């Protein structure tokens, strides 16, 4: 059900996001007794509180136009930045992340490892090449894109 809502909201909201903003992700989840619709937006240099207020004024009325109403319960709209650990949900997002430190979770393990964290050296649209630390040694792994369950930027400590 929530994926259907996300798909409907994405179809309505994505075309309305003006340049230079980028729709990064949409999440719909229940937190406690509240439903939260999170619309994650970014732009070069990051977004401000004023940006989120302006975008909320664009997005909120659009959500009211979706018929029939896809939301089974009342929800809170949250427009925000994706933060430091932004999700990398598209091939384009992964291409833009080359050279950055990322976290990748896999559907099935490679060499008994299901989560890799390291520098994304390359992404050709089909394979991610990551330099990661295995104990004290740097290793390189090639990960087929179709085996990626989730990817996001990560903070290197």
From Swiss-Prot:
GO terms for cellular component: cytosol. It holds the Pfam family DUF150_C. Keywords: Cytoplasm, Ribosome biogenesis. It is found in: Cytoplasm. One of its GO terms (biological process) is translation. Its main location: cytoplasm. NCBIfam families: PRK00092.1-2. PANTHER family: RIBOSOME MATURATION FACTOR RIMP. Required for maturation of 30S ribosomal subunits. Belongs to the RimP family. This is Ribosome maturation factor RimP. The gene is rimP.
């Amino acid at each position: 059900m929530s994926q259907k809502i996300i798909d409907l909201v994405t179809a309505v909201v994505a075309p309305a996001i003006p340049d230079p903003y980028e729709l990064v992700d949409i999440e719909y989840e229940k937190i406690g007794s509240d439903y939260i619709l999170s619309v994650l937006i970014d732009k070069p240099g990051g977004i401000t509180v004023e940006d989120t207020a302006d975008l909320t004024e664009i997005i909120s009325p659009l959500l009211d136009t979706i018929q029939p109403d896809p939301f089974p319960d009342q929800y809170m709209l949250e427009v925000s930045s994706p933060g430091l650990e932004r999700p990398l949900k598209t091939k384009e997002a992964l291409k833009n992340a080359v050279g950055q430190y990322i976290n990748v979770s896999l559907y099935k393990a490679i060499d008994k490892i299901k989560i890799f964290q390291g520098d994304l050296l390359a992404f050709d649209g089909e394979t991610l090449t990551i330099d990661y630390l295995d104990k004290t040694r740097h290793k390189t792994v090639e990960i087929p894109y179709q085996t990626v369950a989730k990817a996001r930027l990560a903070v290197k400590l």
